[in-house]
């Protein structure tokens, strides 16, 4: 019985320690001397992981991560790109579970909302420049919008002015209207407040519309020069055949599609960058930088366009229309001055003399050259002397480049109304009718002649611009009833 005393001692110790201090997994076999350790089944909640299997990155319920997350050398390095975490899990669940909102191609200090600055009040040194830019923008906007709408409405409502020539002029007026209506407010707002309207969308859309407008002007000048040369060298009789409407639409489609295709790389070239500023808080800047997420072939194409963009614009949008117009004018004058050459057919009453003068093409080319020259000079200076220039100088060069395009868009329809006699006459008649003076009275202080002959002349001139003829015209109409 001596072997029973160790058993009694162990039982006494176990009872004295209690069930809380008894070692887990220690069980006594009735027929043995040594304890055998058995594994207890894990009583943790089903689906829960062990603490040692979890990652090193722990989340505190009330301490949400900031953007960007700080990288600690001792912690686990993140393998996913930084994501802006939402301030609460409910908001993250409402936005789709991730809490990430699309930011486009915006880079800069995150988590900081852009603050719109108002330099107009209170008046400071910067206010004078802001007021000058605002007044100039308002003047260009008013003149350009009124002129563009006038040209488009006259060509659209006039029966005898719906020709290929006038349709090209109306196309120019339409693109000038788009540039002034969409691009001018965005550029002016950015210059005053240093914030970009519509963000990255306007950063890409504004250059695309401006370059497309340059392409439309270039191809339109080439088309007008060719048309003027055909008119000068044509041997057709005075009553020319009517040009069908599909032919006019095909010419306009070639001009528009070609211009927009050449301007398509602008949509992939520009990106919006937000930089911190001690004065304005955040400054939006549009830079030429292709996105790294583009395919390899497309990225190389856009990069090639970026490297050749300056000289491509100078050659295609400045040299080509100017040289082409000058060449066509010289050849036309040479042909018209040839001895034995019959003069051009005299236009009829429905198309007054000067409907297609050479001065219209020459004036359009001169305005385009004068407005595009400062833009190209600023681009060359900014490209080759950017290291020696200050930031303020570069911003001034960019502003001159933008407003050169706006000057061209505002002056082109005004030139058409002043140089083209049918457009100018129709505009004056429309102004007289709107002022309540009546189309029968003379405009500009001229007295209307009395008599039935003068009345017939007035009716013919008015119906030729705004209404379809009630009876068959004495000559074949030169316009196309589209």
Swiss-Prot record:
Residues 1-25 form the signal peptide. SUPFAM superfamilies: Family A G protein-coupled receptor-like. GO terms for biological process: adenylate cyclase-inhibiting G protein-coupled receptor signaling pathway; negative regulation of systemic arterial blood pressure; positive regulation of MAPK cascade. PROSITE patterns: G_PROTEIN_RECEP_F1_2 (PS50262). Pfam families: 7tm_1. Undergoes metalloprotease-mediated cleavage which reduces its constitutive activity. Its main location: membrane. Belongs to the G-protein coupled receptor 1 family. Residues 25-56, 78-119, 338-358 are annotated as: Disordered. The modification Phosphothreonine is found at residue 480. This is G-protein coupled receptor 37-like 1. It is found in: Cell membrane; Cell projection, Cilium membrane. It comes from the Eukaryota. G-protein coupled receptor. Has been shown to bind the neuroprotective and glioprotective factor prosaposin (PSAP), leading to endocytosis followed by an ERK phosphorylation cascade. However, other studies have shown that prosaposin does not increase activity. It has been suggested that GPR37L1 is a constitutively active receptor which signals through the guanine nucleotide-binding protein G(s) subunit alpha. Participates in the regulation of postnatal cerebellar development by modulating the Shh pathway. The chain crosses the membrane at residues 135-155, 168-188, 206-226, 252-272, 311-331, 362-382, 399-419. Glycans are attached at residue 105. Residues 40-54 have a biased composition (Basic and acidic residues). It is a multi-pass membrane protein. GO terms for molecular function: G protein-coupled peptide receptor activity; G protein-coupled receptor activity. Residues 156-167, 227-251, 332-361, 420-482 are cytoplasmic. Keywords: Cell membrane, Cell projection, Disulfide bond, G-protein coupled receptor, Glycoprotein, Membrane, Phosphoprotein, Receptor, Signal, Transducer, Transmembrane, Transmembrane helix, Ubl conjugation. Residues 26-134, 189-205, 273-310, 383-398 are extracellular.
């Amino acid at each position: 019985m001596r072997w029973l005393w160790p058993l009694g001692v162990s039982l006494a110790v176990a009872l004295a320690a209690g069930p809380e201090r008894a070692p887990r997994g220690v069980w006594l076999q009735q027929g043995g001397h040594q304890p055998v350790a058995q594994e207890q089944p894990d009583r943790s909640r089903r689906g829960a992981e062990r603490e040692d299997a979890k990652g090193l990155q722990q989340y505190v319920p009330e301490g949400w991560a900031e953007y960007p997350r700080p990288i600690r050398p001792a912690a686990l390095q993140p393998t996913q790109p930084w994501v802006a975490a939402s301030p609460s899990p409910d908001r993250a669940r409402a936005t789709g579970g991730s809490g990430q909102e699309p930011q486009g191609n915006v880079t800069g200090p995150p988590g900081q909302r852009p603050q719109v600055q108002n330099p107009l009040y209170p008046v400071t040194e910067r206010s004078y420049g802001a007021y000058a830019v605002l007044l100039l923008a308002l003047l260009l906007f008013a003149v350009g919008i009124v002129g563009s709408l006038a040209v488009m409405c006259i060509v659209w409502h006039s029966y005898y002015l719906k020709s290929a020539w006038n349709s090209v002029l109306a196309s120019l007026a339409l693109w000038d209207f788009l540039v002034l209506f969409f691009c001018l407010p965005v550029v002016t707002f950015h210059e005053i407040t240093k914030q970009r309207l519509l963000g990255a969308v306007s950063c890409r859309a504004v250059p695309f519309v401006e370059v497309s407008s340059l392409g439309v002007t270039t191809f339109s000048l080439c088309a007008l020069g060719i048309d003027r040369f055909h008119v000068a060298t044509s041997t057709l009789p005075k009553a020319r055949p009517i040009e069908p409407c599909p032919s006019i639409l095909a010419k306009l489609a070639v001009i528009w599609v070609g211009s927009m295709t050449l301007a398509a790389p602008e949509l992939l070239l520009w990106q919006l960058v937000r930089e911190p500023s001690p004065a304005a808080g955040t400054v939006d800047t549009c830079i030429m930088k292709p996105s790294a997420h583009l395919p390899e072939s497309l990225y190389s194409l856009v990069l090639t366009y970026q490297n050749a963009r300056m000289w491509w614009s100078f050659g295609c949008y400045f040299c080509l229309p100017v040289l082409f117009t000058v060449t066509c004018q010289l050849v036309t004058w040479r042909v018209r001055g040839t001895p034995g050459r019959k003069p051009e057919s005299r236009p009829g009453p429905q198309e007054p003399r000067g409907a297609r003068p050479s001065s219209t093409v020459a004036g359009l080319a001169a305005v385009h050259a004068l407005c595009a020259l400062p833009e190209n000079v600023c681009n060359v200076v900014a490209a080759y002397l950017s290291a020696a220039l200050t930031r303020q100088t570069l911003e001034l060069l960019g502003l001159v480049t933008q407003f050169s395009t706006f000057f061209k868009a505002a002056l082109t329809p005004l030139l058409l109304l002043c140089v083209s006699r049918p457009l100018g006459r129709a505009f004056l008649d429309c102004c007289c009718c709107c002022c309540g003076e009546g189309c029968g009275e003379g405009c500009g202080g001229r007295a209307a002649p009395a008599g039935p002959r003068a009345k017939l002349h007035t009716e013919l001139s008015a119906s030729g611009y705004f209404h379809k003829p009630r009876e068959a015209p004495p000559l074949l109409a030169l316009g196309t009833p589209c």
